[in-house]
Amino acid sequence: MAPRCWHWWRWSAWSGLRPSPSRSTPTPGFCQKFSTQEKTPQICVVGSGPAGFYTAQHLLKHHTHAHVDIYEKQLVPFGLVRFGVAPDHPEVKNVINTFTQTARSDRCAFQGNVVVGRDVSVPELREAYHAVVLSYGAEDHQPLGIPGEELPGVVSARAFVGWYNGLPENQELAPDLSCDTAVILGQGNVALDVARILLTPPEHLEKTDITEAALGALRQSRVKTVWIVGRRGPLQVAFTIKELREMIQLPGTRPILDPSDFLGLQDRIKDVPRPRRRLTELLLRTATEKPGVEEAARQALASRAWGLRFFRSPQQVLPTPDGQRVAGIRLAVTSLEGVGESTRAVPTGDVEDLPCGLLLSSVGYKSRPIDPSVPFDPKLGVIPNTEGRVVNVPGLYCSGWVKRGPTGVITTTMTDSFLTSQALLEDLKAGLLPSGPRPGYVAIQALLSNRGVRPVSFSDWEKLDAEEVSRGQGTGKPREKLVDRREMLRLLGH
C-alpha cells in the first residue's frame, strides 16, 4: 500500500507520462535544468557501498540543490570496499577518498547504525523524501543445496572474507586452519582472493589492514594445498587475468594444473574476445609449458600449492567418521553441452572424492528482500526494475547489485549507479515525482529517536577512522580495524 500522501498518484499516470528509456550510458556533460518547485529535492539512498555513494555523487553533481541522505546499517561506511576488497589490494580502496568527498558535502549526510526494514520502513522513507534509491547490495551467499553443507568446517567465502576484513558479524567465525588441504567451490575473483589469503606468507600481510585476529590465525595455519573447483572448463572461469597472475606469482607456492584440461583450447580461443583470450593463454602456458630455470627453481622451493579443478560439480559434503566435521567433498565429473554463453555442465555419471578439512563455498552472493512493500524476485535475487525504476512503485529506485545481480567490478557499479541517478533526475524534471517540500531526515530522525535508535554521522565515522589509523601506526599497518560494535559505540559516547 502506498503512503497516504501518494494516493493521488496513479500508476497509470506514471507509466503513461514516464519519459522514454534513457540512453545506455550517461550523457557526457549531462546536466538538468529544474523548475522552482523542483529545486530542493530530498533524496534518500539506502546503502553506503559503491552503488550508494556513486548514486549520491551523480545526484549531487547534476542537481545543484538536491540533498541526499545515505542510510547504512553498519556503524561505518563504504560497504564492500571496506569489507570485501582484499587487504593486499589497497589500490582498489583508493575510491574511499572520492566517497569521503561526497559524504563531506553540505548537501549530503551519512546516517549509520540504521537498519532500513527494521528501524524504519521503506514506506516511511517514501513519505519523508521525494525519491528513495535502494543500493543495499547482496549480503547473503548462495547455498550449495547439497547434503552435509551444515557440517562444521564448511564456510561461505563471503563470511571468510568478512572475517579477515573486520566485518563485525563475522568475527566469531574462527575458521579451523589446522588441516593441510582446503577446497574452494567456485572459480571467480572472490575464490582467488580467498585462496591467495590462505596461501600468502603471513609476513606479506603484516603491513595491510587485515585484522590482527585473522593475521594471528593465518600465522598458525597448516593449510598447504588449496583446490579451486569449477563446474565448467577453462574457457568459462569467472576470475580475471590480474587475479590469476597474482596466484601464479604468489611467493612460496606453485600451481597445479592438468594439461589434459586444456587439450584443443589453442584453436578454440582464436575467436573469443581479447580479455578472455589473454586469460586462457596464460592458463595454457602455465599448464603446458615447461617453466624456465628461475621459475622452476622457485617452484621447487615452494612449500605450498594451489590448483584448479575443472569439470567438477559438488554433490555431497563428506563427514569425518564421527560425523562431527567435514572430511571431503564428493564431486560429480561433468562435461559441457551447448556453445557460448549457453554452455552448461552436465554430469557424466562418474564421481570422485576430494579430501579436505576446510570447505569454502564461493558460488555467488545474493540480495535479500528489505521490506514487504518492495517488490523482489527471489529467483533472480534482484528488485524488479526498468533502468533502475522499481516496477509499479513510483519514486522508488535501485542501483548496484540489488538492481542487476552480484556481478561486475566497482567501475561496473559506478556506471550502473549513474544510470539510475540519471533516470531519477529525468523523472524529477518531467514532474513525475511529488511536488512541494518534503521533510527528509527531520521526519526520520523523530521516528528513530522515538524507537531508541541513535544514528552515527560521518563525523562520528571520522573519529573511528582516526582511532583505527592510530592503532595501526604502532605495528606499521595503515589501520587496525575496529571490529566490536560495542567498543565503537563506546568510543563515540553512544
From Swiss-Prot:
Name the Enzyme Commission number(s) assigned to this protein: 1.18.1.6
Choose any GO biological process term that the UniProt entry carries and state it: ubiquinone biosynthetic process
Sequence positions bearing Phosphoserine: S313
* UniProt protein name: NADPH:adrenodoxin oxidoreductase, mitochondrial
The gene from which this protein is expressed is Fdxr
> What keywords tag this UniProt record?
Cholesterol metabolism, Electron transport, FAD, Flavoprotein, Lipid metabolism, Membrane, Mitochondrion, Mitochondrion inner membrane, NADP, Oxidoreductase, Phosphoprotein, Steroid metabolism, Sterol metabolism, Transit peptide, Transport
**Membrane topology per record:** Peripheral membrane protein
Q: Where in the cell is it found?
A: Mitochondrion inner membrane
Principal localization?
Answer: mitochondrion
**Range annotated as the organelle transit peptide:** 1-34
| Keyword Flavoprotein annotated | yes
Q: Which residues bind FAD?
A: A51, E72, L80, V116, W401, G408, V409, I410
